[in-house]
């Protein structure tokens, strides 16, 4: 946020990311709104720069935005810069809703941390992630929430908040759209890795007097 060049580049790259897969055009806007509000609150960015950032994202992702608008408003086929944008998947918008929001969130957390009904996603008892890592992921998540709340109280930026807000944005996206597939929640795993590392760090810090033995046990 301090360098104009980096701000513009990040906006362009976020815009490009919205082309990657179907849920990106839900996830990325939700995350950018959350992180923008957080950066504004902690005074890490000015409102003018937020508008510039948003403009870079929107210009880069304009075909995707037009596609989403064609789904929402049932527009006719659009010809834009040599692209043909047609609402060919308009019926999928009916999947978006809030009626099963909490159920969808509970299901995707279970599937990504353990296993679901699809045998190709994860083997029962071995899980998607190693069972030993799950308590540390939970601990790291709690630690990230605590850091986020402290940063709100002190109005200071905490890097943990980026991963936490990205994870929460993913939960909101899945909650609204619903999915029983692990690949629809790929964004979770970078957050799980961060929470795992943070959880291990918190345990090592708490058990500092037993640091060597604790690390040998984990090994």
Segments predicted by a language model, with ranges:
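Membrane-interface alpha helices of multi-pass inner-membrane proteins
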Residues: 7-22, 171-172
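Transmembrane-lumen/periplasm boundary regions of multi-pass, lipid-linked membrane glycan transferases
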Residues: 16, 28-145
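Signature aromatic-anchored transmembrane alpha helix within multi-pass, membrane-resident enzymes
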Residues: 33, 58, 194, 200-219
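Hydrophobic/aromatic-rich transmembrane helices and adjacent perimembrane loops
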Residues: 26, 160-207
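Membrane-interfacial loop-to-transmembrane alpha-helix junctions, especially the N-terminal start
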Residues: 3-6, 50, 152-166, 212-216
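Transmembrane alpha-helix segments characteristic
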Residues: 14, 54, 58, 132-176, ...
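Specific aromatic-rich, kink-prone transmembrane helix
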Residues: 1, 6, 10-14, 32, ...
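Structural signal for the C-terminal ends of transmembrane alpha-helices
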Residues: 1, 33-45, 144-153, 200-208
């Amino acid at each position: 946020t301090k360098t104009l060049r980096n701000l513009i580049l990040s906006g362009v790259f976020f815009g490009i990311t919205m082309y990657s897969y179907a849920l990106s055009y839900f996830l990325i806007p939700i995350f950018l709104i959350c992180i923008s509000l957080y950066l504004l609150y902690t005074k890490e960015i000015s409102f003018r720069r937020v508008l510039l950032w948003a403009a870079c994202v929107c210009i880069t992702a304009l075909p995707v935005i037009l596609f989403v608008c064609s789904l929402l408003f049932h527009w006719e086929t659009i010809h834009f810069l040599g692209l043909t944008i047609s609402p060919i998947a308009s019926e999928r918008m009916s999947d978006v809703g809030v009626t099963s929001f909490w159920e969808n969130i509970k299901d995707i957390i279970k599937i990504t941390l353990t296993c679901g009904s699809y045998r190709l996603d994860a083997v029962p008892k071995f899980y998607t992630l190693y069972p030993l890592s799950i308590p540390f992921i939970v601990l790291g998540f709690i630690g990230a929430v605590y850091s986020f709340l402290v940063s709100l109280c002190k109005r200071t930026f905490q890097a943990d908040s980026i991963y936490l807000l990205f994870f929460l944005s993913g939960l909101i996206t899945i909650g609204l759209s619903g999915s029983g597939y692990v690949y629809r929640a790929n964004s979770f795993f970078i957050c799980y890795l961060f929470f795992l590392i943070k959880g291990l760090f918190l345990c090592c810090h708490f058990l500092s007097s037993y640091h060597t033995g604790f690390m040998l046990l984990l090994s």
